[in-house]
Regions:
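Conserved residues at the C-terminal ends of beta-strands
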Residues: 59, 93, 137, 210, ...
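A structural signal for short, well-ordered beta-strand segments
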Residues: 41, 45, 134, 181, ...
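Extracellular/secretory pathway and lumenal proteins
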Residues: 53, 60, 227, 275, ...
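Membrane-interface junctions of multi-pass transporters
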Residues: 280, 284-322
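The −1 position to Zn-ligating cysteines in a subset of zinc-ribbon hairpins
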Residues: 48, 52, 270, 302-305
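Radical SAM enzyme [4Fe-4S]-AdoMet core and its adjacent flexible, acidic
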Residues: 1-4, 12, 64, 132-285, ...
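Conserved alpha-helical substructure of the radical SAM core
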Residues: 2-130
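Short, charged low-complexity linear segments at domain edges
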Residues: 19-38, 271-291
Length: 322
């Protein structure tokens, strides 16, 4: 199978022609009629995580709710939301989504090759036949990553990645193509971003960078706008030019990270938060975006300081406006 577009081969593209037609209609509506349809989805499939990372938004609003949706509950939710709205790709998050492999399997059954899993990679990576790919969170090189996620966590995740890519091809492609790395840049790890890219280029498929988004002013992890951040972005652009097939961010998207592109205060303005339908672990819609909460009284991300990759990529491609 030829790997044509972000891991999708000829067979995938032919099978998905009706879906592409639906997406095209959505883009026409957005551009010419100012409609606001959801394009992608995200789902917190579990309310538990094995780590307590210092920068993680999820713990801020987590409530001690032991109940999660069952397999069949999720199946019905998928059909009534993501599939009904013809969303192209759904990203599974948490908590730690790999702790509920049966739910990942349901998503893969319902939306084959259109499901990504964001994981800390602490547990062995299971091979799902119909998975799109894994996003593995690495917060810089080993020392910085361990500072954020706990001693020994980098070695554990690295070992699981390397073990996975030793495996046989999946869907006609080598296993390393299933692994994409995501790094959230903050004041602790920003100086290691380039080294992380150099460490993993040629070993995994892609790397994507985003910046820490604060929920409060004065957040010590937020790399504030200004000279240091601008220099960091310029270095990332250089890495993109050096490895255009490895760094997933475009130059335009990276350049957005030098300034406010999202909104005012906690209100989305330029950010197309409507473009991603985000559900929590009970299937409730999260507001104002994928790192928000279904609880209107919960803490909200500061849109004017946003560094999220999933929304900035849309703005960079001309989709904007709340």
């Amino acid at each position: 199978m030829v790997d044509l577009v972000y891991g999708r081969g000829i067979t995938d593209i032919v099978r998905e022609i009706p879906l592409y037609a639906s997406i095209f209609k959505k883009f026409v509506g957005i551009k010419f009629f100012h409609t606001k349809p959801a394009l992608y989805g995200s789902a917190d499939i579990i309310n538990v995580c094995n780590l307590h990372c210092s920068h993680c938004y999820w713990w801020l609003n987590r409530k001690d709710e032991n109940q999660d949706l069952s397999v069949e509950d999720w199946r019905q939710t998928i059909r009534k939301t993501f599939k009904k709205q013809n969303l192209f790709v759904v990203t599974l998050v948490g908590g730690e989504p790999t702790m509920r492999p049966e739910i990942i399997e349901v998503f893969c059954q319902e939306m084959p090759r259109r499901v990504c899993v964001v994981t800390n990679g602490y547990f062995p990576l299971k091979r799902f036949e119909k998975l799109y790919f894994y996003w593995i969170s690495l917060d810089g090189t080993e020392k910085a990553h361990n500072t954020i996620r706990g001693e020994g966590s980098y070695a554990k995740t690295k070992s699981n990645i390397l073990e996975y890519i030793k495996g046989p091809p999946r869907n006609g492609k080598p296993a390393w193509k299933d692994i994409w790395i995501t790094m959230t840049i903050n004041t602790v790890n920003y100086s290691t971003a380039l080294d992380l890219a150099e460490e993993w280029v040629g070993k995994v498929n892609k790397i994507g960078f985003q910046f820490h988004t604060p929920f409060m002013k004065g957040d010590p992890l937020w790399l504030e706008f200004g000279k240091l951040r601008n220099e960091m972005v310029d270095k990332l652009i250089d890495v993109r030019r050096k490895y255009p097939d490895f760094v997933i961010n475009s130059e335009k998207q990276l350049s957005l990270m030098k300034r406010n592109w999202g909104g005012k205060g906690t209100t989305p303005i330029q950010c197309p938060s409507w473009a991603i339908l985000s559900l929590d672990h009970m299937g409730r819609v999260k507001q104002p975006c994928c790192i928000g909460s279904a609880d209107n009284k919960a803490s909200k991300p500061i849109c004017e300081d946003c560094g999220l990759g999933c929304y900035s990529v849309l703005v960079a491609n001309g989709i904007s406006g709340a």
